[in-house]
Every structure is written in structure tokens, then in C-alpha cells.
């Protein structure tokens, strides 16, 4: 099968979040499964700086962006068997960052038009075209409405993956003519209109052959008013083509037996290396080196979406316990300030690190006993899976991908891979935290069994790849 991905970012070339991880990993797994895979990305200035010497020029042409004629260069490289093509236009993509400009609508309108017109020129007409989030969600619409006259495109099946429904691409309806060069018929009849705006995500949901999300629970949640971001009724209407597939993680990169960022390696049969990493981490972040105290890790953006308003409200109560917490992250200045203040009040119990540090993050995943992740909503989440790979048990709010990946501790069977609570409130966070502390202190054999189950969980991309292939094969025979 010929599969083409079109996305706004993709590791290792450009990455701001989970979308970049998916584009870096899923195509590689599909190639291993025997498929022909290509990816189209914007050619950002950071790509030029880091990978420019490895990328070759292929061709160039002009793209009509409404009344504008814009230069479009095509560049190419091959990595892990995947052919990466880049859309080059320095005016649109040499901005020093991926998102956040006033003209993002024009930038990604150009990118989508260029990607569609590039397919013929690079001689890669896919059986399956997989687009991601609002930045490329207009492509299924454009294929069926603007480019339907191109015979080579007639049999292309499309999949839209929603990584985060909050970001929908809502713009003035004038963009249809001014940038995309199409009529207003589909806006006038309501197909593309939402809240009196052109909504790219709605267009993708209605025009793609299939819609996927990054976990089964999130697929269900976005059809409710609580998580649907005002598109829940549209998603309910299209529910027959909506499904969820949990993202994977790189099982080779996040491997406690080989991780190059760790001082000591270990496995589920021998956790002595984990204990040594714990002592090393305590020393590094300025906490008393104690093997007996439960060490809790947090690696996150410090935002309300991640549940840190509830954590801050609970923190004084939590820190009355004989416990240590190490936090790594940046975000809302109010939360940064709160954690910094608590670290001054409880210097032997809380280490607050307001920064971004890849090595420290990896050490937290590997060395801690518990990993706190009480997100208000979480489409998939990767940190809880990384923590489990290292035998660090997640304590999570049962939502989205957290619900799908963390098996809550069952005291009757003594089974599970972590701890969870359903109602996001200080009371239930504290109650679940106490349950975990009691198990850690009084039932070490059960705790050890949970660690083993967590480390044996399969979150590899090869497993996720099989689910995506089932989805693709439902469209392409």
C-alpha cells in the first residue's frame, strides 16, 4: 500500500508536541510492515539549520494561493526507509517557530495546496492519504471540491487524525476565495460554517473517509458536550467513521536496559539499577538521599488543562506525608510561582525545576516510584507510558488516553499498572495518593508486582501500527 502523511510537524525535523512524535514514528513502523510510505512537511528554518546538509533539492513550481502566485520548492531526504518531502517557501516557513503567527491561516492554506499539487510532480499518488489536525484538515475537502478534475486523485482514500480538538482552525469565510480559490457554496449551505466562521476541522471531519483520534476514550469523549469543543454534534452525526487508536512510544528509546541518558540500567527482574538512579536523582535535585521514602515525579506543562490547579490546592496536604516530589516543567506563571513557594517551605520534600531538561526528564521517569498526571483532559498522553516502561507507577485522572493505558490497581486481585481517580478534585486526588502510599509502605510485594506488570505493558509503535493498518485496510483493499 502507498501511504502519504501530510502534517505541520514531524520528528526529528520539527516537533512541538505529540503530533511530531506520531509523524516521526508511525511511518517508520509502516515501512517495517512492508508498505511504501512518504511524508510531506513544511521546510522550516530549524530544519534547514539542523538537517539542511542531508536534504536535496528536487524541483520547484508555483502555487496559486487565491490571486497570489507563490514559489514552492520541493526538497527530499530518506530516513529509516521513509521518504520525507519538504515544502519550501521561506516567506511562510522561516519564522523561527512552527505555529503562532498572525497569518497561520495563509501559511497552512499554502502548505495544503502545495502538498496536493506536489503529489503528481513527485510521482507519489497514494492509496491512502493521512492528514493530521486542523493544519491539514482542509485537504480532504480540497481533493473532492477543487481538485476533483484530476483523474489520478480520484481513488485516494483519506484519514484525518484529531490530536487535540481544541485547535480547530477557525477563520473568516473570505479565505475560501482569497486563499483556497474555491466558491462559497459549501460555506453558504452550512457544510464548512461553524460559529459564523470557516472551520477547517469541521471540513476535515465531514470530508475525510475516516476520522481517528489518539485514544478510544478520547474518540468517545469528543462526542460529548464536555470535551467536544462545540463540534460534538457533528462528530455524533459522523460517529460511524470515528475511532480511536492509542499512540505508541519508541520502545528502543525508552528502554531501561539501554537508555543512554541513565547512569544505571535495569529490567523488571532486577530493579537494583532503579534504586541507584533514585539515589542519584535525589542527590542531583537537592533532596535527602533516602531509599525508603516514596519519590513522586512530575514532568509536564504547568497548566490548568494538566490539572495543576487541583495539585496546587492539594499540595500542602500531600506534603504533610513522609514523601518527596520532584517537578520538571514550565507553564502558567501562577503555577510556577506556587510550586517554587512550596519548595522553599518544604525544601526536603519538594524540588521544583522550572525548565526544560531532556536528561532530567528521563531520570525522573526512571528513578521515581510514582508519576503524577492528573490531566483535566488528555487525548492520549505519552508520559504515563514512558513512566511505566521504567517501573514508575502513574497516578492519573481517568480521562482520555490515561484511562486507556493505565490499569487501575485492583486490591482484590492485586493487579494493575497504576492508580486512578474518576472525579478531578482535591479530595479524590488525596484519597488516591493515600492509597498508593499505603501500598508502597505496607505491601512491597504487591507494589513490586504492579511495577512488573507496568514494565511488561506493550506500548510500542509496532502494536499501534497494526491498528492503523486495520483502519487503512477498511478503506483500501
UniProtKB/Swiss-Prot annotation:
SUPFAM superfamilies: UDP-Glycosyltransferase/glycogen phosphorylase. Keywords: Glycogen biosynthesis, Glycosyltransferase, Transferase. Synthesizes alpha-1,4-glucan chains using ADP-glucose. One of its GO terms (biological process) is glycogen biosynthetic process. This is Glycogen synthase. PANTHER family: ALPHA AMYLASE DOMAIN-CONTAINING PROTEIN, GRANULE-BOUND STARCH SYNTHASE 1, CHLOROPLASTIC/AMYLOPLASTIC. Its EC number is 2.4.1.21. ADP-alpha-D-glucose binds at residue 15. Pathway: Glycan biosynthesis; glycogen biosynthesis. It comes from Streptococcus pneumoniae (strain 70585). It is an enzyme of class 2 (transferase). It comes from the Bacteria. GO terms for molecular function: alpha-1,4-glucan glucosyltransferase (ADP-glucose donor) activity; alpha-1,4-glucan glucosyltransferase (UDP-glucose donor) activity. It catalyses: [(1->4)-alpha-D-glucosyl](n) + ADP-alpha-D-glucose = [(1->4)-alpha-D-glucosyl](n+1) + ADP + H(+).
Amino acid at each position: 500500500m502507498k501511504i502519504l502523511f501530510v502534517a505541520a510537524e514531524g520528528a526529528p525535523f520539527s516537533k512541538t508536541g505529540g503530533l511530531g512524535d506520531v509523524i516521526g514514528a508511525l511511518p517508520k513502523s509502516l515501512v517495517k510492515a512492508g508498505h511504501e510510505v512518504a511524508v510531506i512537511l513544511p521546510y522550516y528554518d530549524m530544519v534547514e539549520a539542523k538537517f539542511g546538509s542531508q536534504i536535496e533539492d528536487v524541483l520547484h513550481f508555483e502555487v496559486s494561493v487565491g490571486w497570489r502566485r507563490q514559489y514552492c520548492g520541493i526538497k527530499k531526504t530518506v530516513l529509516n526507509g521513509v521518504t520525507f518531502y519538504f515544502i519550501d517557501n521561506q516567506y511562510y516557513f522561516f519564522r523561527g517557530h512552527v505555529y503562532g503567527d498572525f497569518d497561520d491561516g495563509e501559511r497552512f492554506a499554502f502548505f495544503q495546496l502545495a502538498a496536493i499539487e506536489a503529489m503528481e510532480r513527485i510521482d507519489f499518488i497514494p492509496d491512502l492519504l493521512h492528514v493530521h489536525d486542523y493544519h491539514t484538515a482542509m485537504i480532504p475537502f480540497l481533493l473532492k471540491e477543487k481538485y476533483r478534475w484530476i483523474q489520478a486523485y480520484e481513488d485516494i482514500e483519506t484519514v484525518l487524525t484529531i490530536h487535540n480538538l481544541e485547535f480547530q482552525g477557525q477563520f473568516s469565510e473570505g479565505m475560501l476565495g482569497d486563499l483556497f480559490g474555491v466558491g462559497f457554496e459549501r460555506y453558504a449551505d452550512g457544510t464548512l460554517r461553524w460559529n459564523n466562521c470557516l472551520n477547517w476541522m469541521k471540513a476535515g471531519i465531514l470530508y475525510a473517509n475516516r476520522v481517528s483520534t489518539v485514544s478510544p476514550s478520547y474518540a468517545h469523549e469528543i462526542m460529548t458536550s464536555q470535551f467536544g469543543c462545540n463540534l460534538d454534534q457533528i462528530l455524533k452525526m459522523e460517529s460511524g467513521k470515528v475511532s480511536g487508536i492509542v499512540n505508541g512510544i519508541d520502545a528502543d528509546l525508552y528502554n531501561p536496559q539501554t537508555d543512554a541518558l541513565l547512569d544505571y540500567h535495569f529490567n523488571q527482574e532486577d530493579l537494583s539499577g532503579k534504586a541507584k538512579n533514585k539515589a542519584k536523582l535525589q542527590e542531583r535535585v537537592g533532596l535527602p538521599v533516602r531509599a525508603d521514602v516514596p519519590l513522586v515525579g512530575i514532568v509536564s506543562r504547568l497548566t490548568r488543562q494538566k490539572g495543576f490547579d487541583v495539585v496546587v490546592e492539594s499540595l500542602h496536604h500531600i506534603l504533610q506525608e513522609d514523601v518527596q516530589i520532584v517537578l520538571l516543567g514550565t507553564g502558567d506563571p501562577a503555577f510556577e510561582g506556587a510550586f517554587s513557594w512550596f519548595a522553599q517551605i518544604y525544601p526536603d520534600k519538594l524540588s521544583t525545576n522550572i525548565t526544560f531538561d531532556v536528561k532530567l526528564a528521563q531520570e525522573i521517569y526512571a528513578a521515581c516510584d510514582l508519576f503524577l498526571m492528573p490531566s483535566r483532559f488528555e487525548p492520549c498522553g505519552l508520559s504515563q507510558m514512558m513512566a511505566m516502561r521504567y517501573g514508575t507507577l502513574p497516578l492519573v485522572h481517568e480521562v482520555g488516553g490515561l484511562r486507556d493505558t493505565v490499569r487501575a490497581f485492583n486490591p482484590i486481585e492485586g493487579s494493575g499498572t497504576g492508580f486512578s481517580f474518576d472525579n478531578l478534585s482535591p479530595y479524590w486526588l488525596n484519597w488516591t495518593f493515600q492509597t498508593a502510599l499505603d501500598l508502597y509502605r505496607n505491601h512491597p510485594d504487591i507494589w513490586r508486582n504492579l511495577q512488573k506488570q507496568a514494565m511488561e505493558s506493550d506500548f510500542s509503535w509496532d502494536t499501534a501500527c497494526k491498528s492503523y493498518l486495520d483502519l487503512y485496510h477498511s478503506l483500501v483493499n
